[in-house]
Amino acid sequence: MNSLPPAEGLAAVIAEAMYQVVHAAQFGRARDALIGQYSARKREEAASPLVRHGAKYFSQNDEDGILLEILRRLGLASGVFAELGVGNGLENNSLILLMHGWKGIWLGGEALAFEVPARGPLHFQQAWITRENCRALVAQGLAALDQQHVDVLSVDVDGNDLYVLRELLAARYSPRVVVVEYNGKFPPPVRWTMPYDPEHIWDGTDYSGASLQALADMLQEFGYRLVACNLTGSNAFFVRVADAGKFADVPADVGALFMKAEYIVMHPGHQTSPKTIASFLATQA
């Protein structure tokens, strides 16, 4: 039978363990402080003033605050959104709009972490999104809500984003705001797009999506201009050229607005509970 160590030896082990715990906590606080300082400096130095409004409520990073400021400038207090690629529904770009009284469509291949009431402001359809079916899926969602147009369109399908977005714009959906994930590995003027693959599943590498320049070029063909990229270099925000006057303080150069991929610059905050979203939707049904 193993014998217990002497009391003084056990005390030393406990003291060392406590030291390591305290040291780890101090290191964590110091790390968070440095990240916070770096993020604040990066936000202030951003070419687009919209980035300084960045804030995380339900988005993955700071997209919520940027989107709300864009909508404020456009004078859009309510409307209709369509988001393609919503994960389990707990973290995306349009949940904040739902909280502000908007109606909208969610499409994605993953089941939601909560139930969506049959009658309410949100229509969800679980489906694998491709270039071939995205038009029909959005049309079905709008019909379910008895709506005819989309004010905010967000696309994050982890691969075929440019192709799906181009298909929807070609279908004459002309949202006031487009939010789309870009590949922050490729700075402008690099033009790169993943070859179209309707069966593509993101493997966690940089083989995904399209460069910011490729997306900006495509969206320009449909009358849109870039106004911001979020702090982590994940999502780009576009508005109609007709609304450019409301963003006169934003430079037109895509390279100046580009944010490289830096996912460490945002603190995750409190995790969203499915109960929070479910309880809100229950009040809207």
Question: Across the structure, where does each feature detected by a protein language model lie?
Answer:
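Membrane-proximal basic amphipathic "stem/tether" segments
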Residues: 1-51, 285
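Short, functional N-terminal and low-complexity linear motifs
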Residues: 30-38, 104-106, 181-186
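Short, hydrophobic/amphipathic alpha-helical patches that form generic packing surfaces
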Residues: 32-33, 69, 96, 218
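Short amphipathic alpha-helical segments, especially helix-boundary/capping motifs
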Residues: 39-46, 69, 188-193
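General secondary-structure edge motif
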Residues: 46-50, 77, 199
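SAM cofactor-binding core of SAM-dependent methyltransferases
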Residues: 51-144, 148-155, 184-187, 269
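Conserved acidic-Pro-Pro-aromatic motif
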Residues: 80-83, 96, 116, 122, ...
